[in-house]
Amino acid sequence: MGPIRIGVGGPVGAGKTQLVERITRALIDEVSMAAITNDIYTIEDAKILAANGVLPEERIVGIETGGCPHTAIREDTSMNDAAIKDLVERFPDLELIFVESGGDNLSATFSPELVDFSIYIIDVAQGEKIPRKAGQGMIKSDLFIINKTDLAPYVGANLDVMVEDAKTFRKNKPFCLTNLRTDDGLDKVLEWIRHEVMMQDLQEA
C-alpha cells in the first residue's frame, strides 16, 4: 500500500516549510515520516527543514525543479515520483511523506496521482481579501490554513472577514487559523492528520 502522501502548497513565505517542520516535530514519536521540498533553483527549504526540524537529513529530499515549480507537482511529477520511490526503498517503514511545492500562486494544485491529500496555506499578511479570491489551491485542498494570525492587527486584516469568506468557498471542507511561530492552532492540523488522513479512529476501533 505504501506511505500516505500529503501535498503542502501555498505562496512564497506563507509558512509551508515551517508547517512541515511543526507537524513532523509533533508526530515524530508516533509516525514514520519523510519530506520532499520543491524549488526552482535551490534546495534551500530542504536545508532549513534539516537544520531546524527533527527529521534525519537522509529522510529529506530537495528537488530543484527548474522553470515553473507548478509543473513538478501537477503536469510532470516524474522528479517527485522518483524521490518518493527512493525514500520508500530506503525506508520501508514510512507512513507519511510530505511533498512541499515551490512557492506558487493561488491556482496551483497537486496531481491526484502524486498525493493522497493536500494542504494549502496562506498568510494573513497577504490581505484579508485573499480567501475571497477563492483560488483553486484554496478550494480543492483537503485542508486550508490561514497562517500568521498574529500579524492581523499590523496589516489591517480582519480575521472574522477571512473566516466568513473561507466558510463560503470551503462549504463543508475543513479549514483552520494558525500562528505556527507559537504553535497556536497546530492542534487542529494534527487532529485532521490523525483522524482524516491516518484514520486513527478506525485503527483503534
Swiss-Prot record:
<dbReference type="GO" id="GO:0016151">
    <property type="term" value="F:nickel cation binding"/>
</dbReference>
<keyword id="KW-0547">Nucleotide-binding</keyword>
<comment type="function">
    <text>Facilitates the functional incorporation of the urease nickel metallocenter. This process requires GTP hydrolysis, probably effectuated by UreG.</text>
</comment>
<feature type="binding site">
    <location>
        <begin position="10"/>
        <end position="17"/>
    </location>
    <ligand>
        <name>GTP</name>
    </ligand>
</feature>
<keyword id="KW-0342">GTP-binding</keyword>
<dbReference type="GO" id="GO:0005525">
    <property type="term" value="F:GTP binding"/>
</dbReference>
<keyword id="KW-0963">Cytoplasm</keyword>
<keyword id="KW-0143">Chaperone</keyword>
<dbReference type="GO" id="GO:0005737">
    <property type="term" value="C:cytoplasm"/>
</dbReference>
<dbReference type="InterPro" id="IPR027417">
    <property type="entry name" value="P-loop_NTPase"/>
</dbReference>
<dbReference type="InterPro" id="IPR003495">
    <property type="entry name" value="CobW/HypB/UreG_nucleotide-bd"/>
</dbReference>
<dbReference type="Pfam" id="PF02492">
    <property type="entry name" value="cobW"/>
</dbReference>
<protein>
    <recommendedName>
        <fullName>Urease accessory protein UreG</fullName>
    </recommendedName>
</protein>
<comment type="similarity">
    <text>Belongs to the SIMIBI class G3E GTPase family. UreG subfamily.</text>
</comment>
<keyword id="KW-0996">Nickel insertion</keyword>
<dbReference type="InterPro" id="IPR004400">
    <property type="entry name" value="UreG"/>
</dbReference>
<dbReference type="GO" id="GO:0043419">
    <property type="term" value="P:urea catabolic process"/>
</dbReference>
<comment type="subunit">
    <text>Homodimer. UreD, UreF and UreG form a complex that acts as a GTP-hydrolysis-dependent molecular chaperone, activating the urease apoprotein by helping to assemble the nickel containing metallocenter of UreC. The UreE protein probably delivers the nickel.</text>
</comment>
<dbReference type="GO" id="GO:0003924">
    <property type="term" value="F:GTPase activity"/>
</dbReference>
